[in-house]
């Protein structure tokens, strides 16, 4: 949750700071959040616990008296989603809700996939994903009912999708009926993510990558089913006869494929920028995704992207900077890897301008001003 005052000079100023980290107010500990997540799994609503932390957060909002409250990533079990939204509506505080996932308009699913229940009513849910499953029965319908009741008649709420894909789904959902939905793509720091050929060459040497061998990178915070790590392994196996070296970054999972090296967690954005620059292609094997940041970062570093055409992934691949292939089609992905050409400098420059975080900030500032005349 980001709490800002309105700026009159073209920038944003936060009126609350802590000594540990500027612009940040911690309302609960990681241990508290994990405990609340466990409570939800036992028998409660998804994101419907955290009473103490929510009271503390609402107290900070009362203290700061913001012109706008901007909500992002509320599924971390650090606040009661329903109580916070109801408070902001009742207090008539202009509120921006950015959609990084679908749970704000479903019965709790981060990604509804092929389910269309959210279009009419989330009821009789059989998906029982990690967000909605609990020991005492599925509470997806109760979650959807609460959200729909809160959104109804909320005329000071603006919903923003990071991608056109999620914005279309949100606008079509019955829970958000009548709420304006716009699109502001995420941005990245192009002062960090830029082509680094010299550092990339040194990294390739340190990994004993032979000259002329193409490097295929997979990057994800966790090697999960949703991120498609199993499909990435299938891809690496199918390319065993080709002059390709596969790298996987972000998780400590080890595998014994001879053409695959797992790098574990990469500490620091600069190190990631070097890794992107060292790769010839970034592959995105996600089964579901909204607007993956790794695609923006790789493009800004001059590395083309090959990903499955799911969610907002095609929107992150600009002309000349990669290809989106049919979902789950590892064979199509392998064929593209063998023929994809390096991007032209003009295409990289276009990506850097398009994904610059300053563009995103200006778009949000314009929205804040429209909401606070």
Residue ranges and their predicted role:
Residues 342-372:
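A charged, aromatic-enriched C-terminal amphipathic alpha-helix characteristic of glycosyltransferases
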Residues 304-307:
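Short hydrophobic beta-strand element within catalytic cores of glycosyltransferases
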Residues 274-279:
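Short alpha-helical donor nucleotide-sugar binding micro-motif in glycosyltransferases
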Residues 287:
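Aromatic "clamp/platform" in nucleotide-sugar-dependent glycosyltransferases that forms part
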Residues 165, 187:
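Carbohydrate-associated surface elements
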Residues 319-330, 338-342:
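Conserved acidic donor-binding segment of nucleotide-sugar-dependent glycosyltransferases
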Residues 1-4, 8-16:
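Short, small-residue-biased leader/transition segments that mark boundaries at the very start
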Residues 160, 210-227, 233-236:
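Conserved donor-binding/catalytic core segment of Leloir-type glycosyltransferases
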């Amino acid at each position: 949750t980001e709490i800002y005052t309105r700026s009159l000079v073209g920038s944003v100023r936060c009126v609350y700071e802590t000594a540990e980290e500027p612009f940040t107010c911690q309302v609960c500990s990681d241990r508290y959040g994990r405990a609340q997540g466990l409570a939800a799994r036992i028998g409660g609503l998804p994101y419907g616990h955290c009473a103490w932390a929510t009271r503390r957060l609402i107290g900070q909002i009362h203290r700061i008296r913001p012109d706008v409250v901007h909500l992002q990533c509320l599924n971390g079990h650090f606040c009661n989603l329903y109580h916070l939204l109801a408070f902001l509506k009742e207090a008539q505080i202009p509120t921006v809700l950015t959609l990084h996932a679908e749970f704000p308009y479903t019965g709790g699913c981060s990604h509804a996939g092929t389910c269309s229940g959210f279009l009419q009513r989330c009821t009789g849910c059989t998906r029982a994903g990690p967000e909605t499953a609990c020991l005492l029965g599925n509470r997806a319908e109760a979650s959807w009912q609460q959200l729909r009741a809160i959104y109804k008649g909320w005329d000071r709420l603006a919903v923003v999708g990071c991608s056109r894909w999620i914005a279309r789904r949100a606008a079509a959902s019955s829970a958000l009926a009548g709420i304006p939905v716009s699109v502001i793509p995420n941005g990245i720091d192009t002062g960090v993510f830029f082509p680094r050929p010299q550092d990339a060459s040194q990294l390739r040497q340190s990994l004993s990558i032979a000259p002329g061998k193409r490097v295929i990178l997979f990057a994800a915070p966790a090697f999960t089913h949703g991120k498609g790590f199993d499909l990435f392994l299938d891809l690496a196996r199918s390319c065993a006869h080709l002059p390709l070296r596969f790298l996987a970054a972000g998780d400590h999972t080890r595998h014994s494929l001879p053409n695959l090296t797992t790098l574990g967690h990469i500490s620091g954005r600069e190190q990631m920028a070097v890794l992107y620059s060292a790769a010839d292609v970034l592959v995105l094997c996600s089964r579901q995704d909204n607007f993956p940041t790794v695609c923006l970062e790789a493009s800004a570093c001059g590395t083309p992207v090959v990903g499955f055409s799911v969610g907002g992934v095609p929107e992150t691949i600009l002309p000349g900077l990669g290809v989106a292939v049919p979902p789950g089609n590892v064979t199509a992905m392998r064929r593209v890897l063998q023929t994809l050409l390096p991007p032209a400098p003009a295409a990289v420059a276009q990506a850097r301008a398009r994904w610059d975080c300053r563009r995103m900030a200006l778009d949000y500032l314009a929205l804040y001003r429209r909401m606070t005349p």
